[in-house]
A protein has these predicted regions:
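C-terminal substrate-binding subdomain of Rossmann-fold SDR/epimerase-dehydratase oxidoreductases
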Residues: 17-18, 24-151
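Flexible, glycine-rich beta-alpha linker
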Residues: 1-17, 41-42
Length: 151
């Protein structure tokens, strides 16, 4: 997620979709924002600049270091934040970032999806990379991008 994301109201991912939904509710002084599901599923998010820095880090690795931690058939590298959050916690964080004063209403008639999505990022961490952008900071940056470029 981050600058350049898809903020379409019907076919975006959860962060850009919620940023837009909370922003529009704030502008309209709506009493609430509807969020799909129960809010219980956990998701991991990675800011776009962190993904880019991970790619550059791996491309710049010395071959000896890379080969020490990988093998021919096991050379894939997961990149993640090593942190997951419930959709409920995410919605509250986005509500705060946007400055929406209304309520969050979970629509339990809509699907939750998988209960947890958190990847194993141990290898990239062993190779010396860790994300730098916190979720809250990334959400603030993404919201500023939305305001500046999507309205």
């Amino acid at each position: 997620y981050g600058p350049g994301d898809n903020y379409h109201p019907e076919n975006s991912h959860v962060i850009p979709g919620l940023l837009r939904r909370f922003h529009e509710a704030k502008i309209k002084n709506a009493p609430s924002v509807r969020v799909w599901g129960t809010g219980k599923p956990r998701r991991e998010f990675l800011y776009v600049d962190d993904m880019a820095s991970a790619c550059i880090h791996v491309m710049n690795l010395n071959n000896k270091i890379y080969n020490k931690f990988t093998s021919l058939m096991c050379s894939h590298i997961n990149v993640g934040s090593n942190f997951d959050i419930t959709i409920n916690e995410l919605a509250k964080m986005i509500k705060s970032v946007v400055g929406f004063k209304g309520k969050i209403k979970f629509d339990k008639t809509k699907p939750d999806g998988n209960i947890r999505k958190l990847i194993d990022s141990k290898l990239i961490n062993k190779l010396g990379w860790k994300p730098k952008v916190s979720l809250e900071d990334g959400l603030s940056r993404a919201y500023k991008d939305y305001i500046m470029n999507k309205l």
